[in-house]
Swiss-Prot record:
Coiled coil: none annotated. It comes from Serratia proteamaculans (strain 568). Its EC number is 2.8.1.7. This is Cysteine desulfurase IscS. Gene3D superfamilies: Aspartate Aminotransferase, domain 1, Type I PLP-dependent aspartate aminotransferase-like (Major domain). Pyridoxal 5'-phosphate binds at residues 75-76, 155, 183, 203-205, 243. The modification N6-(pyridoxal phosphate)lysine is found at residue 206. Homodimer. Forms a heterotetramer with IscU, interacts with other sulfur acceptors. It is found in: Cytoplasm.
Length: 404
């Protein structure tokens, strides 16, 4: 077993060796290096064929028509293109958008930008289990609501939203529904031929494909229109200009092909490992599970260890690559906005750790993790005056701290 142990698969994944091998075929002179938009010679045709194959592989995993898949530079761009693109195109129908407070920053910051441009956005608070109440969503819908953006799986706590029911509600009212599926694709079955979802964002690097490539599903029946955000050449049916990076697209296609084949067995294995990890730490004092084991993806476990500071815990766990909050926001020392939105105290949110497991996680690594966590928590609590006070029965919330 090699240290440190990587348990941050929700931040990114290593490229699967099969994917890396596939990508190598599209880089050098002796490979298929052409521009897929070059229509006048074989180099271009072969590159275009590789893109078509990948587009089909992605469409097959999610039950879409390949013509509904638009390649982007990643899920962040897909979220931007979907939300800004739909808002700009349909703004004559209304300027109201609904999303949730626990979305990824790529959705929240995009909505904030649209607010600056004159749109109105309702940010729904989830219930304490992380799920958006369908009644609250319905109550927020108005005559001028044009777009709802609610993710499939949350990147911090792994809870799964009922995108099927939300889709039905939106379709019945003629509202466009966008789903960020970055954390669910390849982990949960998605069938867009049955779901009433109009726009869906995908990433390559969260399921063992390369970074810097993603896709946006844009429904054809009923036809959804979006306004392009990047212009120049009219690639990707006019929705996203720019020379297609064939090596990255082929890599993403291969990653999605592998996911389709291995998803069922891989998720069963990860569920066993995640449950093993939780069972190994849940009997400690003041340990809380954030999210839900029943209604969550099998690869994410978010746990709060009360009376232990998250930052010091991460330092103590230096042999584990884990995160507190998500990588996109962990550069700041603010407690996780997702956990705060669940109604958690700052202290408890600050003491949370996200363990995310993946294809190369082993049972041996999980057992080592359990031992290390138990040892580290014990040591940090021995050093903590707050833990002493808690053990003596002092109500810490009632203490008035001196302001120096």
């Amino acid at each position: 077993m090699k240290l440190p142990i990587y348990l941050d698969y929700s931040a990114t994944t290593p490229v699967d060796p099969r994917v890396a091998e596939k990508m190598m075929q599209f880089l050098t002179l002796d490979g298929t290096f052409g521009n897929p938009a070059s229509r006048s010679h074989r180099f271009g045709w072969q590159a275009e064929e590789a893109v078509d194959i990948a587009r089909n592989q992605i469409a097959e995993l999610v039950g879409a028509d390949p013509r509904e898949i638009v390649f982007t530079s990643g899920a962040t761009e897909s979220d931007n293109l979907a939300i800004k693109g739909a808002a700009n195109f349909y703004q004559k129908k209304g300027k109201h958008i609904i999303t949730s407070k626990t979305e990824h920053k790529a959705v929240l910051d995009t909505c904030r930008q649209l607010e600056r441009e004159g749109f109105e956005v309702t940010y729904l608070a989830p219930q304490s289990n992380g799920i958006i109440s369908l009644q609250a969503l319905e109550a927020a819908m108005r005559e001028d609501t044009i777009l709802v953006s609610i993710m499939h799986v949350n990147n911090e706590i792994g809870v799964v939203q009922d995108i099927e029911a939300i889709g039905e509600m939106c379709r019945a009212r003629g509202i466009i529904y966008h789903v960020d599926a970055t954390q669910s694709v390849g982990k949960l079955p998605i069938d867009l031929s049955k779901l009433k979802v109009d726009l869906m964002s995908f990433s390559g690097h969260k399921i063992y494909g390369p970074k810097g490539i993603g896709a946006l599903y844009v429904r054809r029946k009923p036809r959804i229109r979006i306004e392009a955000q990047i212009h120049g050449g009219g690639h990707e049916r006019g929705m996203r200009s720019g020379t297609l990076p064939v090596h990255q697209i082929a890599g993403m296609g291969e990653a999605y092909r592998i996911a389709k084949e291995e998803m069922a067995s891989e998720m069963a294995r990860l569920r066993t490992l995640r449950d093993r990890l939780w069972n190994g730490v849940k009997d400690m004092e003041e340990v809380y599970l954030n999210g839900s084991l029943e209604n969550g993806v099998p690869n994410i476990l978010n746990v709060s260890f009360n009376y232990v500071e998250g930052e010091s815990l991460i330092m103590a766990l230096k042999d584990l690559a884990v995160s507190s909050g998500s990588a996109c926001t962990s550069a700041s020392l603010e407690p996780s906005y997702v956990l705060r939105a669940l109604g958690m105290t700052d202290e408890l949110a600050h003491s949370s750790i996200r363990f995310s497991l993946g294809r190369f996680t082993t049972e041996e690594e999980i057992d080592y993790t359990i031992q290390l966590v138990r040892k580290s928590i014990g040591r940090l609590r021995d050093l903590s005056p707050l833990w002493d006070m808690f053990k003596q029965g002092v109500d810490i919330n009632s203490i008035e701290w001196a302001h120096h």
